[in-house]
Amino acid sequence: MSCCASSAAIMVAEGGQASPASEELWLASRDLGGGLRQTELSVPNAYCGTCIATIEGALRAKPEVERARVNLSSRRVSIVWKEEVGGRRTNPCDFLHAIAERGYQTHLFSPGEEEGDDLLKQLILAVAVSGFAATNIMLLSVSVWSGADAATRDLFHWISALIAGPALIYAGRFFYKSAWNAIRHGRTNMDVPIALAVSLSYGMSLHETIGHGEHAWFDASVTLLFFLLIGRTLDHMMRGRARTAISGLARLSPRGATVVHPDGSREYRAVDEINPGDRLIVAAGERVPVDGRVLSGTSDLDRSVVNGESSPTVVTTGDTVQAGTLNLTGPLTLEATAAARDSFIAEIIGLMEAAEGGRARYRRIADRAARYYSPAVHLLALLTFVGWMLVEGDVRHAMLVAVAVLIITCPCALGLAVPVVQVVAAGRLFQGGVMVKDGSAMERLAEIDTVLLDKTGTLTIGKPRLVNAHEISPGRLATAAAIAVHSRHPIAVAIQNSAGAASPIAGDIREIPGAGIEVKTEDGVYRLGSRDFAVGGSGPDGRQSEAILSLDFRELACFRFEDQPRPASRESIEALGRLGIATGILSGDRAPVVAALASSLGISNWYAELSPREKVQVCAAAAEAGHKALVVGDGINDAPVLRAAHVSMAPATAADVGRQAADFVFMHEPLSAVPFAIETSRHAGQLIRQNFALAIGYNVIAVPIAILGYATPLVAAVAMSSSSLVVVFNALRLKRSLAAGRGATPGTLIHSGAVTS
Amino acid sequence: MNTLIYLIPVALSLGGLGLVAFLWALKSGQYEDLDGASWRILDDGDGEGESSQTL
């Protein structure tokens, strides 16, 4: 209970700062037909039954919500909602607010990101079928080993054959397909010895059964398949999923814009048909379609696409604007200076397509091992066969021993060695609030020696936050929120989030770009905005850090905002230092701001005023100097470097594109997620190497036994199972060390932000 | 030998029953939320009656 009782005021602000736009939520929801849509939100702070009841209750109270169900294992809530209620189009942001009001953080996760896929279902089915076959055949085999007489033994062998045959075809098809693919292209992989061992042992056993032989390997071939399928299924769960970062980015460029002809007539044209020199009108709330120059109008522009900074810049006649930036407050008339394909967003897309740095070149540990393993195994089996032919000259016996060698060396433990550790490590990371996209990312993270961090949104929270809410009376805050509803300015959004749900104020509303909002009501003229605008006098601070609410130029309240550093930043940087990792800052922001933050965090290596391209260059330079860098960033401007880096990480508050491009996403606020993820990955890497050592050690003992012909089916069954079990138990040690290591880094993560009241 | 004639089918069908039960559980989403299920058992629903609804 206590873990859920969190201070609503703080959490609302947190929930709000992460809230994606309504438009993004619509696009990310899945159409179920019949006017219903489904949205998946992640709720990293949900921990217990009360959380389930609270969140589901809050959502079900809304008329738009058809069904809501919290999944505590994946920390997600799935909401099925109606597109329209009473003729009003549903705003999915209301769900985020409803959850945030109860004190929970929410992040959007687009469907494709973690959806269970068909192949995984098929693999689980295959595991179930092979498990069924393995247990039943083992039952019969135990009877045979206990000394069933000849006729009974034959019967048991035949029944085993009947069970094993279909099971091998059904469950073994994954290995056969993959092995066939490899052979057809003249390569060999881990699946070739598997497919060979399984089918050869089945064939030999069938031959033995027909000839009333004593030894049959049906149990070995099916058990082998069972263990390997478990490894394959776990491995599949850790595979990287298709990244849609680039398509997400393309969504940021509008499809078209209104072009004004010299004669004054207007025409809506597709973005590709806009030529340099055309005059365009960009209304408030629209994205700039192509790079251009402002001809007339004043507005606040959200340039986070370009420099990652959330505070809008005021643009006026003569300023240049980049494609993809969002026009927040006033209409602008632009002159296009570049065609869409030469514009800023197109450049970022190009950079991202080009940037496939360490990721593409990296070969996974298991693949590297397989490259040496399978030829060695084949050679060994062949030599055994030849050797026994020379010694005895009995084809049948030589074949039996060779098959035994293949079965014994089959990479059972090896196939489990990596995926089990990675699944356990991913589970541990998830408990600490870090999501892993794929297993190779963890292997890469264990190798890094440098961390490059973005500033805004990564080292800092990145959004203005109301810091003096306790000084302001709730009534004033509600009034301000009612006015702020009319604006998209981040300050206005911050006020709305602090006040919770607000109904818009009635009256004559006007938004003055670069200044604030004015509402003429019966009580008088309310103004919310800069001090200069609201009360007609300049204040001590700049406009960004405060907003004034006034009635007829009398100050009613002063709201102060700050972009706070992310919690535990300093401790995390120190922890990275202790791990022997160098840190640096890559920022698009102005040099003095970056320098101040860098010195307060004790980081000497920093770069400021970097464009997305320059960020990639800094990262590439580090790679050329032999460093393996982890890049932590959140903005769209970071997306290319996130992709180019050896491995990358993004906070869940990051832009959709940034989240998609990163290998890891951390859901809680403190930056300690970064050292925590690195430590866990390194620990996992250690366990993987231990597991390899165990698997190789097993082979060193078992292979001579098999080559000498002492590996009966009983010996094979015992050896294979025990080696697999040892590997699995070794991997589970990682889970135990979670309990022990909780005091160190992840402790601060577990209940971050959930302030007990 | 005679007992085997019915014992083996019994053993196999019991195993098959387990397989079918597992597949059913998988398909009906019993493994979707292992952590949540243990908490939901304590939820008395407070008259909403919706808590048992599956998606």
Swiss-Prot record, chain B:
Q: Which UniProt keywords apply?
A: Cell membrane, Membrane, Nitrogen fixation, Plasmid, Transmembrane, Transmembrane helix
Q: Which GO terms describe its biological process?
A: nitrogen fixation
InterPro entries from the entry?
Cyt_oxidase_maturation_cbb3
One GO cellular component assignment for this chain's record is: plasma membrane
Q: Which residues cross the membrane?
A: 4-24
**Cellular localization per UniProt:** Cell membrane
Q: What is the recorded function of this protein according to its Swiss-Prot or TrEMBL entry? A: The four proteins FixG, FixH, FixI, and FixS may participate in a membrane-bound complex coupling the FixI cation pump with a redox process catalyzed by FixG.
Q: Which NCBIfam families match?
A: ccoS (TIGR00847)
* UniProt protein name: Nitrogen fixation protein FixS
| Source organism per UniProt | Rhizobium meliloti (strain 1021)
What gene does this protein come from? fixS
